[in-house]
Amino acid sequence: MNSTINHNLPALSNEGGLSAYLEQIKKFPMLAAEEEYMLAKNWKTTGNVKAAEKLVTSHLRLVAKIAMGYRGYGLPVNEMISEGNVGLMQAVKKFEPEKGFRLATYAM
């Protein structure tokens, strides 16, 4: 796997804050089931980091939505989103698309 790729993933920062991050992640389109399957197969068989990156970015809004549901539990939302994003990346690594489930279902 190529680890020298320049990643342009959005990040939560103190400068723009949560609202800027939420605006950034709206730019990433959701994937059709077929495209998600092909990207996941590509990632699994060839280690194509761009395919994995597209899988991750297409699910960032889901992570943010779930984290927002836990506001008021004493944890900062930005930390919950960051941890959720790490979990999403781990789920992409272990995801087996041939089992017939969507990534969002597996990641939960």
PLM regions and their residue ranges:
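Alpha-helical promoter-recognition and RNA polymerase-docking modules of transcription initiation factors
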Residues: 2-108
